[in-house]
């Protein structure tokens, strides 16, 4: 008996990992199945969410997972709504079954909405209905009191606003996903912490929403703790042709449609941009153009966010042909923007390529920044503690000048509009080859290639 009680705590401690399960889902499955084997898959992702436990893996079989015709389309509805949380030692993983391509088609407010913590989403394709939308009808819908999810569907949405302050979503990884053609935002995180968005392709999103969305957006980061290290990581993503074509209802004109945006981590309650129209704003600047608010909404008392002291990394991304900026921060602090390539952004709303706006402690190094014809490299509006150096841009500018900047054509191999076909690697003889700085070194480039490969580091998203 004595030996039994010695070993029982050990058995209990190991029971979590040992009992972790694989759950199987397929569009050809049945929610009455056990879900325990590939031969007995569930049909819906929501059924899997109802049984998943910390440490479990949900394996998505190939095919299309679509919203049912009678699906709930009220605010905060989603094809998959993730409320369950994993643990620090037992994350929950949602991933494509090896060799298969699961694709989500949602007509609700999001394809995936994540309210829980400790989740990994890996290798999932989310495709929206942009090809079906008529712009005039989207504009008409934006003027109605009752909002229609069809014109505002987000892709992958980490949503913390409805969680109590002590349980905001945190420790979320979105990787190897393809998010495209969403009428709303592509990958969005609001009131969350410890979020990594990496190795994704995000394109043709935010076209028809009325809330000023973008390809990849973080808004109102909510600190889980103040431990050192990066809390927000956006790396090795391709983000292109995200834009807005319907006026943002708060200002009555087009706004945002950026490739990558880190938005509002300060404590000021006024002037927040908002990809989903819930955060109230006050009169004042709401975007890089300084457009005033023309529509006010009643504001409910909300808990005050913890002061954001943590650091974010935006690195090795390619952001091109977006209607807003390639990359920018707005009312945000403590961000490292390293080894990115931006190209021909801002054609819809006129934003600059890459810039901080009303931000503090932003480090911008080793980037290649190529504005569209007539466009601008960067701007400076009420910023403090900006570090800018080792950047390459083809047209001179006087906003920020690093001693190691180079003004020259970086010589891309093939800067085609479809990034699935383009080649933004550097041609032989490029001034960006081997001339980068060594501060904040990145281990790999956009393609996963080791940095550096030679004597010096390359600038931009690719190492050669």
Q: What are the roles of these predicted feature ranges?
A:
Residues 27-62, 66-67, 79, 109, ...:
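Acidic Gly/Asp/Thr-rich repetitive segments characteristic of extracellular carbohydrate-active
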Residues 85-95, 113-123, 148, 153-173, ...:
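Surface-exposed loop/turn motifs in large extracellular/passenger domains
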Residues 68, 102, 107, 124-130, ...:
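Surface-exposed loop/turn segments connecting beta-strands in extracellular beta-rich domains
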Residues 52-103, 113-125, 432:
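Beta-solenoid repeat scaffold
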Residues 71-79, 89, 288, 310-423:
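Predominantly extracellular beta-rich ligand-binding scaffolds that present long acidic/polar faces
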Residues 66-68, 73-80, 107-231, 235-236, ...:
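Right-handed parallel beta-helix
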Residues 421-423, 430-464:
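Surface beta-loop-beta hairpin patches that serve as ligand-binding interfaces in beta-rich domains
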């Amino acid at each position: 008996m004595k030996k039994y009680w010695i070993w029982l705590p050990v058995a209990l401690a190991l029971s979590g990992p040992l009992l972790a399960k694989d759950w199987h889902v397929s569009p050809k499955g049945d929610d009455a199945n056990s879900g325990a084997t590939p031969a007995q898959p569930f049909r819906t992702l929501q059924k899997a969410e109802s049984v998943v436990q910390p440490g479990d893996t949900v394996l998505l079989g190939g095919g299309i997972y679509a919203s049912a015709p009678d699906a709930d389309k009220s605010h905060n509805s989603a094809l998959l709504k993730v409320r369950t949380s994993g643990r620090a030692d037992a994350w929950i993983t949602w991933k494509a079954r090896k060799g298969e391509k699961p694709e989500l088609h949602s007509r609700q407010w999001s394809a995936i909405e994540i309210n829980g913590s400790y989740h990994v989403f890996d290798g999932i394709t989310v495709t929206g209905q942009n090809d079906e939308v008529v712009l005039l009808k989207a504009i008409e819908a934006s003027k109605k009191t009752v909002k229609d999810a069809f014109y505002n569907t987000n892709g992958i949405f980490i949503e913390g606003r409805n969680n109590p302050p002590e349980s905001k979503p945190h420790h979320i990884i979105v990787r190897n996903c393809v998010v495209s053609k969403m009428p709303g935002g592509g990958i969005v995180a609001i009131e969350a912490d410890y979020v990594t968005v990496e190795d994704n392709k995000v394109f043709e999103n935010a076209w028809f929403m009325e809330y000023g969305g973008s390809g990849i957006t973080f808004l109102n980061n909510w600190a889980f703790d103040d431990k050192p290290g990066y809390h927000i990581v956006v790396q090795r993503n391709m983000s292109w042709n995200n834009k807005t074509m319907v006026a943002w209802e708060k200002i009555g004109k087009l706004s945002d449609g950026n490739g990558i945006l880190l938005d509002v981590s300060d404590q000021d309650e006024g002037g927040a941009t908002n990809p989903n129209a819930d955060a109230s704003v006050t009169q004042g600047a709401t975007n890089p153009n300084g457009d005033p608010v023309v529509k006010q909404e009643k504001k409910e008392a909300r808990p005050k966010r913890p002061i954001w002291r943590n650091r974010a990394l935006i690195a090795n991304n390619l952001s091109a042909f977006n209607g807003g900026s390639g990359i920018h921060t707005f009312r945000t602090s403590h961000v490292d923007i390293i080894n990115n390539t931006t190209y021909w952004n801002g054609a819809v709303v006129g934003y600059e390529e890459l810039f901080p706006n009303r931000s503090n402690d932003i480090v911008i190094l080793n980037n290649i920044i190529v504005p569209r014809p007539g466009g601008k490299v960067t701007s400076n509006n009420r910023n403090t503690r900006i570090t800018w150096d080792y950047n390459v841009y083809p047209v001179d500018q006087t906003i920020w000048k690093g001693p190691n900047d180079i003004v020259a054509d970086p010589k891309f191999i093939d800067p085609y509009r479809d990034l699935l076909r383009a080649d933004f690697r550097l041609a032989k003889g490029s001034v960006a080859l081997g001339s980068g700085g060594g501060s904040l070194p990145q281990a790999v480039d956009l393609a996963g290639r080791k940095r550096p490969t030679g004597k010096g580091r390359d600038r931009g998203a690719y190492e050669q």
